[in-house]
Amino acid sequence: MHHNHQEMQDCIQQCWDCRTECQETLFNHCLEVGGKHVEKEHVKLMMDCIQACQTAADFMTRGSALHTSTCAACADVCEACAESCERIGGEEMKRCAEACRRCAESCREMGKMKKAA
């Protein structure tokens, strides 16, 4: 299975959207609200998601032959982050979880693909 340029561009955009949503939610909501929003494991997952999305987008933008591996890893991280956000609950966390799930779905598909020759 090969990817096309548009599929990759869409995945890159999903990664950037997820990264932005997680970063804004973490800094503009979680750190303001406190409590369960700033529990160590949740904050680490959000930071992991921010970094994984950035890395996957960077690999795809460069056309790295290893982008499928980073996309597969990004999908796993995004799923874990979405689950954590859903456990916390609330409208902001729901939006973040939705962005994570969209990115995970896109990255999971990209992770299954091989670069066209």
What is each model feature region?
Residues 1-117:
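Amphipathic alpha-helical hairpins
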